[in-house]
Every structure is written in structure tokens, then in C-alpha cells.
Design a protein with these regions (language model features):
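N-terminal export leaders
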Residues: 6-10
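C-terminal segment of classical bacterial N-terminal signal peptides
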Residues: 17-26
Length: 326
């Protein structure tokens, strides 16, 4: 009996000491955040995604009172950054700020994904939705999707189009399948790399990201024919959807903040609360609109369900776009 008492007292003493030092999980959770938060970006510094991550990191730092740094870990379609986060301590101090559509797609584009996005990550907060766009140069006589389709059917495999990422590839592939086209895909490293061929007319059209497409629209270089979202976007309200043009789809990229799945619920809810607060700010909503997106607010539970649906949807997208597994 004395031995049991001594053990009990020792355990109690350790627990009290740990709590006093801020070492117990419950205390650490209640204190969150009390150290620097790292937001992990899967794209290089200076990229469009990096601009979005850094913008929100600054805004969330202000409402949370936390010090937030952005770490860029590009490569393997986001898998390097994602794996880094899944292996990190589930305490809310390492946040994966990435496109949910990309991690969902990776589940089907890699033979052996390094992690299971649904099992290993929890969506803490969603931020925005961004469609891709069908664009032609302003010098093109084509002004509508109907005219583009008529032209492409006439040209057959003599016509080509430009893509530079997976979402653009999927958008164009769905369009080709729905319209029964033989147009040839030409892949570029970036939207900027394809500019000369698009402006010269060597490419019949481009399926590109909204940030680049809208910037070219504002500078008078592009004419936008359609967006891939189910509804028109605030940043280009006059541009119809692919569905309106006769090609039903709701294929969008969406940004989310994800944490390791074992992260305490209270911590996840704090991140969600900060993000909701930030998304309610007028300048933030304008930023999202200017980037070609629409604000996307959800609870962690709703975000996780959306992620599950995206994983299922991307199985079909990858098949339609004939994307080989890596």
C-alpha cells in the first residue's frame, strides 16, 4: 500500500509540474496559440498561391495575435508539403494552406500516395473557390463558346489548345468530351510560358487559372469565354459558365487550411473562427474577388465532407482527362 501511495504521489507531482510548465496537452490546447505558427505553402515563393497564403497569414496573425510564418515546400504536386504536415505534431502550429482540389486529385494521380488526405488531414477552414477559364486572345474573331466549338469541329486535330496545370487540363478534357472534339492539347510549364503562342493564334484557346486570366483580361489581351464553376464569379460577372454554354460542370479549385487529423477539436475550431472573422472583412472579400474567386466559408465538418466529395469527383476527372498515374 505505501508503494502505491508513493507512485500515486509521484504521478500527481509530475502532472502538476507538467501543467505548471505548460506541458500538458489540455493546458497547451487552452493556451493555443502561444508559439509561432507555420503555414506550409506547396508552391514556390512569388507564385499565385504563395501570394494568397501570405495575404491570409498576415490577416489571421492580426485577429489571432499569433506570429505566423510561411514556409514554401514545393514539389510532387503538393505531396512534399502535405506529407510534411501529416508528420508534424498535431497541435495546430503547422497548417497546410493548399488547394483542396489538388490534394484530392493526388489521391488518384499517384500510384502510391504518401498519405491519405481524408484520413491524415482535417480541414480546419475553407477560404475560397476559384474556377478555371476558357480564354482566347482579343484578336480572335471567336466571341462565344458556341463559336469556339464550331471552329474546333471544323479544324479537327489541326487545332491546339494550351494548358499548364491539372485543373486546366481537366476543364479542357471535359469540354472536349462533351463537345466531341479532336483538338490537340499542348502543355506548358506556366500560364506565362504559353502567352506568345496564345497571342499569336497558334493556340485556339487556353484553359487557365483565374488569377492569370483576369490579369490578361484587365490588360486588354484576353477575351474570356466561360468559367468552370456552377455560377458566375464576382470578379467577371459578364462571363458565362460552361453550364450556361451547354457543357454542364462545376469544376473549381478551392483553398483550405488543413491540419493533422489528430489535432484537438478546440484548436481546429479556433483556426476556423479566425478564418471566418477574416473572411468577413471587406478588403479580404475584395482580394478574393480580384483573384478570380468567391468566398467559401464552412465549418470544419462541412469542409471535411467537401474534401471527401472532391476525392470521389477527382477519380472521374482523372479518367476523363486521361491523366497517367505517377
Amino acid at each position: 500500500m505505501p508503494t502505491v501511495t508513493r507512485r500515486f504521489m509521484l504521478a500527481a507531482s509530475v502532472a502538476v509540474a507538467g501543467s505548471a510548465l505548460g506541458l500538458s496537452p489540455a493546458a497547451a490546447q487552452a493556451d493555443y496559440p502561444n508559439q509561432t505558427i507555420s503555414m506550409i505553402c506547396a508552391f514556390p515563393a512569388g507564385s499565385g498561391a504563395d501570394v494568397i497564403v501570405r495575404f491570409f497569414a498576415e490577416k489571421i496573425a492580426k485577429v489571432s495575435g499569433a506570429t505566423i510564418i510561411v514556409e514554401n515546400k514545393p514539389g510532387a504536386g503538393g505531396n512534399i508539403a502535405g506529407q510534411y504536415v501529416t508528420r508534424s505534431k498535431p497541435d495546430g502550429y503547422t497548417i497546410f494552406f493548399h488547394t483542396g482540389s489538388a490534394v484530392a486529385g493526388n489521391m488518384h494521380m499517384f500510384k502510391t500516395p504518401p498519405f491519405d488526405v481524408v484520413k491524415d488531414l482535417q480541414v480546419a477552414a475553407t477560404v475560397n473557390k476559384q474556377p478555371h477559364m476558357i480564354a482566347v486572345p482579343v484578336s480572335s474573331p471567336i466571341k462565344t463558346m458556341k463559336e469556339l466549338t464550331e471552329y474546333l469541329k471544323k479544324e479537327g486535330s489541326n487545332a491546339s489548345y494550351a494548358v499548364n496545370n491539372t485543373s486546366g487540363k481537366v476543364l479542357a478534357a471535359i469540354y472536349k468530351q462533351e463537345a466531341g472534339l479532336e483538338t490537340v492539347e499542348v502543355a506548358y510549364k506556366s500560364s506565362a510560358d504559353s502567352m506568345n503562342d496564345i497571342m499569336s493564334g497558334a493556340m485556339a484557346f487556353a484553359a487557365q487559372d483565374p488569377v492569370f486570366s483576369l490579369s490578361q483580361l484587365r490588360e486588354g489581351r484576353y477575351r474570356l469565354l466561360a468559367v468552370s464553376s456552377a455560377k458566375r464569379i464576382p470578379g467577371a460577372p459578364d462571363v458565362p459558365t460552361m453550364t450556361e454554354a451547354g457543357y454542364p460542370m462545376d469544376q473549381v479549385g478551392w483553398f483550405a487550411m488543413m491540419v493533422p487529423s489528430a489535432t484537438p477539436k478546440d484548436t481546429v475550431n479556433k483556426i476556423n473562427g479566425w478564418t471566418r472573422q477574416v473572411l468577413g472583412q471587406e478588403d479580404v472579400r475584395k482580394f478574393v474577388t480580384d483573384q478570380g474567386g468567391d468566398v467559401f466559408v464552412s465549418t470544419p465538418e462541412e469542409g471535411q465532407e467537401y474534401l471527401k466529395k472532391e476525392v470521389a469527383a477527382w477519380a472521374g476527372y482523372v479518367k476523363v482527362a486521361n491523366i497517367p498515374q505517377q
